[in-house]
């Protein structure tokens, strides 16, 4: 029998890091549109509040909390405020990431690499350990890490970022083994090139963009909403049997292979 509410998130509370723009903003908006109460988080509160305003104007419910993924105490506060506001956390989306270096590995400074790994990997482990016990107690939860197809290939421009995203995929598999027995579904999304401010150095480069579009089966780069829908799937009943996986949403770059 068809279940018309397979993607319904009514009654659920979702916390989204990096939620003020790009992919994160789309995830916030899409989850709110499907009924979730959303905690929009990023470093800058005004940007989060703008997203919240848009959600509320469309009849959704959301609140803004400023937090930097580089500071564990700020993430602890994010989780605490979310619980104080909505009494629970059902969905945790780790979308925020940093990539302060664009260039060859020969020029990568050690402290920059350490920052990338802490922000893009360690922060996700912190958040899982913060929200996991509550989800385990309820025997229900969804934990989503936004990775990248860069995790699955090499890069001459953003190798350190790609390494961190590969580590996230390994983290997802290990967390799934640890928390899956509590009915917590832990998965990753690996977007291809998406037209966001974060990836502007790539899509705004005519040569890189043309190369990406020529490789993609769909012959285009992605938009934030192309990823927001995947997150809704993983957070909803539609994704109830998906755990420890990475969903590639890249327009067919990897799947199409070389021509």
Where are these regions (language model features)?
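Active-site helix of classical SDR
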Residues: 128, 164, 172
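Alpha-helical segment proximal to the catalytic Tyr-Lys
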Residues: 133, 177-181, 240
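C-terminal substrate-recognition "lid" of short-chain dehydrogenase/reductases
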Residues: 86, 125, 140, 220-249, ...
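Residue(s) in the substrate-gating loop at a strand-loop-helix junction
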Residues: 148
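Conserved glycine-rich cofactor-binding loop
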Residues: 13, 20-21, 44
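Short C-terminal tail/terminal secondary-structure segment
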Residues: 2-5, 102, 153, 232, ...
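Substrate-binding pocket helix/loop in short-chain dehydrogenase/reductase
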Residues: 103-105, 109-114, 212
């Amino acid at each position: 029998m068809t279940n018309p509410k397979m993607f319904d998130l009514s009654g659920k509370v979702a916390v989204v890091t990096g939620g003020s723009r790009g992919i994160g903003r789309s995830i916030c908006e899409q989850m709110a549109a499907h009924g979730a109460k959303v905690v929009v988080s990023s470093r800058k509160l005004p940007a989060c509040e703008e997203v919240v305003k848009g959600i509320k104007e469309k009849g959704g419910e959301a609140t803004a909390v400023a937090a930097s993924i580089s500071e564990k105490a700020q993430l602890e506060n994010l989780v605490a405020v979310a619980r104080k506001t909505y009494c629970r956390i059902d969905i945790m989306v780790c979308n925020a990431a940093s990539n302060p270096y664009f260039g060859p590995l020969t020029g990568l400074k050690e402290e920059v690499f350490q920052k990338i790994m802490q922000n893009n990997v360690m922060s996700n482990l912190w958040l899982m350990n913060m929200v996991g016990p509550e989800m385990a107690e309820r025997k229900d939860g969804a934990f989503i890490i936004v990775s990248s197809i860069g995790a699955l290939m090499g890069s001459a421009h953003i190798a350190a970022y790609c390494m961190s995203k590969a580590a996230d995929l390994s983290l997802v598999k290990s967390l799934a083994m640890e928390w899956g027995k509590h009915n917590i579904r832990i998965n990753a999304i690996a977007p291809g090139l998406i037209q966001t401010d974060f990836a502007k150095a790539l899509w705004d480069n005519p040569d890189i963009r043309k190369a990406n579009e020529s490789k993609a089966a769909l012959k285009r780069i992605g938009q934030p909403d192309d990823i927001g829908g995947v997150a809704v799937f993983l957070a909803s009943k539609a994704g109830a049997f998906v755990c420890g996986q990475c969903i590639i949403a890249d327009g067919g770059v990897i799947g199409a292979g070389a021509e």
